[in-house]
């Protein structure tokens, strides 16, 4: 068919041209949907006056009554009709999540219970309940200890008189050989209460002159066998018991003690067991492992078994291990060739509380046990009480305890203000402990309180002499100057401790905190709340409440020990947490009359330089500036931002683990997650806070510390060699680390070698 040359031209209006639709990619489906709606709205363009008249309208209802409106008619815009353009350029990033900076002092919930705020200076000093006895007749010699041991306590350890629980337990355990349950309040000297009779019994077996061999040496020495085992729930408590025991045995050098705990090398522990031990301090898990796998551990002569902190042993799940240990000790027991050794084993259970778990542990290990306590005259009263009151804890009478109801947004600045005021004057407080709920929170707050100030960064380059006066920092990153609440006249050193650190780092950090003679603060989890006798601890702050009342008892028990004065402060949030005050009052003999309340605003005023009585609001400005500075510091450093998010998530998980009896007071549904996120220097919405990967475990943390130590030692690598771990992050993002590891391995495998001739 021939072309006729016909051309057709169609005229279309500009409004009828169909624009190509751009397909949005990336982001969540909600973000794509909102961006699509915005693009569709902009594509319509601005409406004109003619458009409104040209649109067809529905027929008017004849039954409708027209009422004249008093509102004047709108005037037409005369600015060129660029309202649509202005609207389109107002929020160029409207599809991205915006950060909302909330104010510290607005929309905070008010405390539900209004109580009178008492000043600590107006509280009458109570008589110490765990101090040594003043009566001169109650000396260690009168209790049955040998003169050499009593003289060693007086001259070397500077112990002149026993405490009430030591008096009751030493006399009972030296007279009879039956099982015993020792119950006393924290800080009353329970460790010496069972160690002194133990050492006295073993010294009596090896008394020179009465029982000696042909060479005149005592019969009992390190090769004579193992006579006593002391079990403790934590490694730190085992270390402390071992130190106290070694100090006692300096007057009997022929008796040898040792430890086997988790985290140490089994090879070195087996070597110590082969050399011979008379007293062994151990954790249940490691002792059960040695009983199964170490032939050098002979327990046929064990006649004393001590279970320290029995309630904690059961809480940590050591019930099966303890059952296995008791059965193996019974099965392997043999008559001893050494004269004077008892025929049966004596078991001693120690605990500050008498709970159902402790009673169950007593059923496993004790037989016809004697209940030893500091106040034997109160036994009839306690027998009449209910089981709940029997399990109630006791707080030392000289401990001054207070609580502060602090809103969630103000927690971080209030804690900082409190320690600014505490360490404002040199010598007022020497050592303090901050207890938090999880290890991630410990790491985050340690970085916040030890971060370098902007002024310090500029001074370091010019003033090199001032750096010599700063407290030494730890190569492991667990010790650093506390720049947040230090001042030139009173520098403060901050220590951190939690269970995810390697054992050698935990031991060195705890030892450095105990030996430090300057102002220092330890921020830790409950790993340091049981049995540790840290010297000169004047203040305990529970930033996160304990998971049970018994844990609270052991936390505040780190201060006010053996008759010393001490203070404790707990942070509570407005709302259901205020009911926890009744639990705190039950721990006092007088019903909680000595328990005081601290006002959160007064803490902020004192800490940030304001006067409590004046109406000046400068302290609010200073507190807000400090909070915003911390938030900017976290935003500028991705590492610290991820640390803050991880700490926030771990804190929420830990908050949900309170015991059932107290869960109504710590209801996770009552938490304002947005306000709580601000206490972790976060500006994100709680729903947007997501941290990939898992927290480093003990093994990964141990590898990181080992790698840092090797790099510090300056080990040289072989020429031409490469390390696979160079391109791998420190396991913060597990998926990325695994992906990079596979890529690195593929590079090594695919490279040319002697088998790849091509």
From Swiss-Prot:
GO terms for cellular component: nucleolus. PANTHER family: RNA HELICASE. Its EC number is 3.6.4.13. This is ATP-dependent RNA helicase dbp7. A motif (DEAD box) lies at residues 308-311. A motif (Q motif) lies at residues 138-167. It is found in: Nucleus, Nucleolus. It comes from Neosartorya fischeri (strain ATCC 1020 / DSM 3700 / CBS 544.65 / FGSC A1164 / JCM 1740 / NRRL 181 / WB 181).
